[in-house]
Every structure is written in C-alpha cells, then in structure tokens.
C-alpha cells in the first residue's frame, strides 16, 4: 500500500470528525515602530462530511495595521464591525464537537487562535506536512499544492483570503481522501 493510500484510508476513517480551519491576522510588519503582537481577526472552518461552515470576524483589539485589510481581503469597516473575542469563543464552542480533528495548512493560525484563547485542545492534522511527505517537496501555500494534488478548491460562501484559503484546503483534503489513481502508483514517487 502506498503512502498516499495509507493517508486516504486514515482520512476516510476519520472523515466525519474532520474540520478544516483557517485564520487571518491583524499583523504589523516585524520592524514597524507601532508593531503589536498579531491577533486573529478572521476565523473560518468547514466540516466536509456535513458541509457545515463556520465564520467569525473579530474586531481588532489593537490598532488595525495599514496592510491588514488588503492582506485579508476585507474592508476596514467590516473588520472594525466584527464581534468580540468572547463571541468568537462562544460561537466556536457551539460549532465544535468533542471528537473533532482539526485540519490546517501549517500551524501558525491555529497557534495564534489558541493564544487568543480559542479552545483548540483537540487532535489536529497539519495537511502541509502530510502533502510535503507525500510529494517530497515543501509547499508554502495550499493553493500552490493544488495542481500537484490534482485538486480543485471547494466552493464555500466565505469572505476574503480566509474563505479562499479554506476553499483550497477543503479541496486538497477531499482530493487526498480518494485512493491514488493507478498512474500515481506506477510512475510517480508517492
């Protein structure tokens, strides 16, 4: 059995528990004189097995970095009108289940959200690490891996870069749930 088939079997066995997550931050350039620590301002999630989707926009708790609206692809007004961190935590607690397994692309936004107090003490899968092992190369973004995986983004009605990135993550996950096509096991290094 190929490594890809083993991953597909693992994902299929846990499919009902998988929740793809992505966050976006209000973050200043590292050496900016007004720099404060990054904070989560957009958190999105999707449960592929049931098509349940979660979205929370949190108002910045500190000064909005000048580049943040363009970076996260949301207007300053939308960001400033976001909810509180407590509202986000409460809504997230209502969305999650005790046996969830979070699926993310890298750990930065998960770690940032945990630092913001989001309860994330559940198992997780870093899909970037899994894809890097399978394809024997490192991908910076989930979008950069799509062609190599033969994946297409799953259309999700979510705003901004967070929505786009989550759509790509869900598409990548769905492509990996299927066993490798025959040509993948005979000619390529999986």
Describe each region flagged by the PLM:
Residues 21, 82, 104-106:
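Short His-Asn-centered micro-motif
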């Amino acid at each position: 059995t190929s490594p890809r088939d083993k991953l597909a079997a693992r994902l299929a066995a846990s499919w009902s528990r998988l929740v793809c997550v992505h966050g976006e931050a209000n973050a200043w350039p590292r050496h900016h004189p007004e720099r404060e620590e990054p904070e989560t301002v957009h958190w999105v999630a999707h449960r592929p097995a049931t098509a349940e989707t979660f979205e929370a926009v949190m108002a910045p708790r500190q000064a909005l970095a000048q580049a943040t609206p363009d970076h996260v692809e949301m207007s300053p007004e939308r960001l400033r009108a976001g909810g509180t961190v407590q509202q986000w935590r409460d809504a997230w607690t209502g969305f999650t289940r005790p046996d969830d397994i979070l699926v993310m692309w890298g750990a930065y936004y998960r770690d940032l959200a945990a630092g913001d107090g989001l309860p994330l003490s559940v198992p997780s899968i870093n899909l970037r690490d899994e894809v890097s092992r399978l394809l024997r190369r490192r991908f910076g973004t989930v979008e950069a891996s799509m062609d190599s995986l033969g994946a297409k983004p799953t259309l999700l009605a979510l705003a901004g870069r967070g929505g786009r990135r989550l759509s790509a993550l869900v598409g990548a996950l769905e492509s990996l749930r299927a066993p490798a096509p025959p040509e993948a096991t005979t000619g390529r290094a999986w």
